[in-house]
């Protein structure tokens, strides 16, 4: 891609974002990301926003359809359940295609060409995120593989972030937010999720005075999401304990709601 066409692709991606045509935004930013040159911060963020929007819409659709499927199943409506199942699988295929698309770009281009610690953390976090999205709906060996790869991405990002980025850095905080959601949602490890979220929050609080003005808003937003998740997960644990004692069914019915990512999502992720 020439310098001019790269500039054009970025401009068209911004235009697509304004028009809320996120598939077009993805195509333009994917062409920029595939040049084997380090992306600027702006380009990196445009790429993230593009994929986040196309995947976010389908994740929300999948949750709604899955919820309806469960309700129809409980009513014994077999014919409707079959129709819903086919529709859900169609959404899952779209989710799989999008995730595989960005994961290929990350593995072939972005991660190998990342020079700065910030970029490396950002891309390894994305690897963790998109394998996590696959693990949300996959079953059996595919779910295990997706969970393993997600963990690998988050761990690689965490090692670099801990060594190179300040505890108040928005990317490090966003990583902690998403990694803790991974432990809670995918590995069913609420204790580990709470530990990770609390550690990130406490470390950031202790260095709040050193927070730069430009990242203050982003950092404090993610810190609030970390705290919100801790509150939610703690109340979930208390309710589960009470429910177990009282033999109440349906104690764990808090589905994740959507919110911005890196950016962020309650059981929020960033």
Swiss-Prot record:
GO terms for biological process: cellular response to heat; meiotic cell cycle; mitotic cytokinesis checkpoint signaling; mitotic DNA replication checkpoint signaling; mitotic G2 DNA damage checkpoint signaling; negative regulation of induction of conjugation with cellular fusion; protein localization; signal transduction. Acts in cell cycle and stress checkpoint signaling by sequestering signal transducers regulated by the checkpoints. Required for the DNA damage checkpoint that ensures that DNA damage is repaired before mitosis is attempted. During environmental stress, sequesters srk1-phosphorylated cdc25 in the cytoplasm to delay the G2/M transition. Sequesters byr2 in the cytoplasm to prevent its translocation to the plasma membrane. Sequesters ran1/pat1-phosphorylated mei2 from its non-coding RNA activators (including meiRNA), to prevent meiotic induction in vegetative cells and to regulate meiosis I. It comes from Schizosaccharomyces pombe (strain 972 / ATCC 24843) (Fission yeast). InterPro entries: 14-3-3, 14-3-3_CS, 14-3-3_dom_sf, 14-3-3_domain. Keywords: Cell cycle, Cytoplasm, DNA damage, Meiosis, Phosphoprotein. The modification Phosphoserine is found at residues 34, 66. Belongs to the 14-3-3 family. The keyword Cytoplasm applies. Homodimer. Binds preferentially to mei2 phosphorylated by ran1/pat1. Binds preferentially to cdc25 phosphorylated by srk1 during G2; the interaction is increased during osmotic stress. Interacts with byr2. Interacts with rad25. One of its GO terms (molecular function) is protein sequestering activity. This is Checkpoint signal transducer rad24. One of its GO terms (cellular component) is mitotic spindle midzone. It is found in: Cytoplasm. Residues 242-270 are annotated as: Disordered.
């Amino acid at each position: 891609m020439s310098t001019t066409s790269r500039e054009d692709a970025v401009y068209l991606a911004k235009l697509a974002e304004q028009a809320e045509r996120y598939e077009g935004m993805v195509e333009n930013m994917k062409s920029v990301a595939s040049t084997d040159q380090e992306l600027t911060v702006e380009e990196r963020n445009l790429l993230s926003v593009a994929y986040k929007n196309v995947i976010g819409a389908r994740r929300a659709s999948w949750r709604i359809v899955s919820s309806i499927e469960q309700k129809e199943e409980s009513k014994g409506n077999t014919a409707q359940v079959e129709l819903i199942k086919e529709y859900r699988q169609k959404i899952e295929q779209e989710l799989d295609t999008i995730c595989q698309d960005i994961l290929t770009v990350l593995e072939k281009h972005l991660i190998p060409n990342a020079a700065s610690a910030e970029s490396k953390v950002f891309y390894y976090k994305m690897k963790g995120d998109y394998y996590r999205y696959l693990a949300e709906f996959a079953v059996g060996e595919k779910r295990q593989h997706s969970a393993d790869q997600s963990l690998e991405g988050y761990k690689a990002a965490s090692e670099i972030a801990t060594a190179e980025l300040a505890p108040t850095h928005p990317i490090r905080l966003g990583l902690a937010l998403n990694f803790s959601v991974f432990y809670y949602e995918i590995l069913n490890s609420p204790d580990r999720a709470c530990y990770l979220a609390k550690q990130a929050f406490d470390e950031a609080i202790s260095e709040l005075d050193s927070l730069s003005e430009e990242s203050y808003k982003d950092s404090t937003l993610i810190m609030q999401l970390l705290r919100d998740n801790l509150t939610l997960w703690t109340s979930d644990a208390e309710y589960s304990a009470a429910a177990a004692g009282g033999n109440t069914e349906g104690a764990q019915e808090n589905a994740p709601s959507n919110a911005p990512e890196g950016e962020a999502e309650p059981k929020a992720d960033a």
